[in-house]
Amino acid sequence: MYIKNLELINFRNYEILSLKLHSGINVFIGDNAQGKTNILESIYYCSIGKSHRTNKDKELIKWGARDAYISVYISKERLDKKIDIKIFKEGKKGVRVNSIKLKTISDLIGVFNVVMFSPEDLKIVKESPSYRRKFLDIELSKLNKKYYYSLVRYNKVLNERNTILRKWNSNTEVTEVYDHQLSKYGSYIIKERLKYIESLSIRGNKIHKDITSQKENIEFKYITSIKDLNNIQNDFYNLLRENVKKDFEKGSTSFGPHRDDFAVNINNTDTRTFGSQGQQRTAVLTIKLASLEIIKEQTGEYPVLLLDDVLSELDINRQKYILNSIREFQTIITGTGLIDIREYLDDHVKLFKVTNGTVNQ
């Protein structure tokens, strides 16, 4: 899968932009705040229908304009597909695939897969469990519609249960119907996360050993309050019922996939607490490259890889490793100063210069 063309109208600092991209490596170079990341953001938006930088779509619309337009023309499984998205200032958006309007934005997920690695992704390793859960939810939703719908239903039931916990007077029986639903949807979410983490560990350790010249092993472990992983639904339901009084006191649900986490261990040591900045950055790189391989395995095609100003933060050997690893699929790279990647990729590279919302080859 690769992007043939990208068009933007009134998106961020771009009034009009039309680009023909290389099926291999595309490098956008320019000073900070010129619009490099905006290009990657528009591509990411066409993958999951939201930005990786903001929850407010109106921020994507160029100042003074009423709406923004993004279009990507992609080659997928030897078939061409066109995704058109119009973002309106009032908060609405319209999405079409091959001129057919999608009923919901969720129908876009899985049509066009990307994997992005940006400086913000360090939060996956460094920050709170919510960032790791978000990573799992996005990656699994790309691959599994049932997971996405289970997640939506779980969050809806969770919000309803929490409302009851805050507003009712400790009537433990009233939550029982919600507990059945939470355990049903939540058990599926946990099962799929466990399988994904296992795949991530297998692929990730091989990649990480290659990156670190066989000096480090990496392992990912899913952390959940569920004890009986052979009977997750029943164990989860019992956990909810046993703790319902405590939940009424707190006004929130104490256990479930919304509280789960996963550990990132390098050489059996917790990377979040004890890893160096370099180890944490390499761990995220491993996670991203492993997730890319999982998508390839499950869909038959590599996604598009987006690297937003991250190469310059890696040492020369890790830069070379990435550049030697991305020959098989389309990659779009941004940076202010990069090593001469033509030396490593020959004619696989197309270079662009970005200056204040204009792009030149």
From Swiss-Prot:
Q: Which GO terms describe its cellular component?
A: cytoplasm
> What keywords tag this UniProt record?
ATP-binding, Cytoplasm, DNA damage, DNA repair, DNA replication, DNA-binding, Nucleotide-binding, SOS response
Which Pfam family is an annotated match for this chain, by its short name?
SMC_N
Q: Which GO terms describe its molecular function?
A: ATP binding; single-stranded DNA binding
Its localization reads: Cytoplasm
Which PANTHER family does the entry link to? DNA REPLICATION AND REPAIR PROTEIN RECF
The record's family statement is: Belongs to the RecF family.
> What does this gene product do?
The RecF protein is involved in DNA metabolism; it is required for DNA replication and normal SOS inducibility. RecF binds preferentially to single-stranded, linear DNA. It also seems to bind ATP.
Its name, as the record gives it, is DNA replication and repair protein RecF
Q: Which organism is it from?
A: Clostridium novyi (strain NT)
